[in-house]
Amino acid sequence: MNSKPSTPVATKGSNFLTSDKMVVNILIVTAIGMAVIAAAVGAGRDNPLTVQILIGAILVDIVGTILAARGIALPGRILVPGILTIAAGFVAYTRGGLYHIAVAGFPVVIVLAGLLLGVRGSFLFATFASIAAAIIGYADINGISPFSQSSRTGYDDIAVAATLFFVTAIVLRVIIVRLTESVQEAEAFGQAQETANVELKKLQGELEQRV
């Protein structure tokens, strides 16, 4: 018995964004992006831990891509944004806190989650990113993290980061909803055009019979 393709987890009407084929493409692009970043970081040879984390994320991404290509897309949809959130948070915590460039990866993860899991996925990972930012910021302020920036980090930084994460999710929701509406309008127009063509052929046939 043939296995059915996995059901998209996205919100209703956004299946065109989260089909298994689209998931495969997104995961491939994500793997390439992580490989480029890992190569760039590895060239400096001063942050081997980050390279190792990225390599682990790439391996998970590859496994998710293989499964998605075989119709099992759910693991890739969940694991890839999940491990990227953990990776970005861990690197930021150990290397420079909220001022590390890794924090810029959180909005990317939110967008990725939105594409893979739908609107709810983007808000879910915006929440995860906000929690990670709160932990990192708290560790910075209290001198807990290895590279504490207590003299620079404040609770307002945590609030700003969380706000930006949720704004990213909201903007993504607006874009997805608008794209979904456009696709639905195009499909409705196509169906109306097809119905009109059928009626036209029917009338043409009746006219030919009368003649």
Regions found by a protein language model. Name each.
Residues 21-112, 129-134:
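Hydrophobic transmembrane alpha-helices and their membrane-interface boundaries in multi-pass
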Residues 174, 181-211:
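Amphipathic alpha-helical coiled-coil "transmission" helices that mediate dimerization
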